[in-house]
Amino acid sequence: MLARIDAGTAPTILDVRSRWEFAAGHVPGAVHIPFWTLPARVTEISGPRADPIVVYCGHGPRAYAAGIVLRAAGFRHVTYLEGHMQKWRQAGLRQAVGGSR
C-alpha cells in the first residue's frame, strides 16, 4: 500500500478512528471521517461509487461497521487495510501526523 501511496496510484484510504487517534499517526494521504459521523458525512468521500476504497481503524471493528455503511451508500469496492493501524505501526511503516483533512 505504501508503494502505491508514494506512486500516486493508491485508492481512497479512509480512516474511521477518532480525531485524537488520527492526529497521533495515520496512513499518509488518508481521508479522516470518524466512524460515528460517517452516515452523515459519506458524501464527503470523493470519486465514483465504483472506485475502490480501503477502510481502516485501530484493530478492525469500526472499519468493518463502516464498510456496511459504505456499501449501503453505494460503494461497490470496499476493502480493509490488512491488520489495520495496529499492524501498520508494528511494521514500522511511515505515518503522517496531525489533524484531519
Locations of regions flagged by a protein language model:
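Rhodanese-like catalytic fold shared by cysteine-dependent sulfurtransferases
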Residues: 2-12, 19-54, 58-101
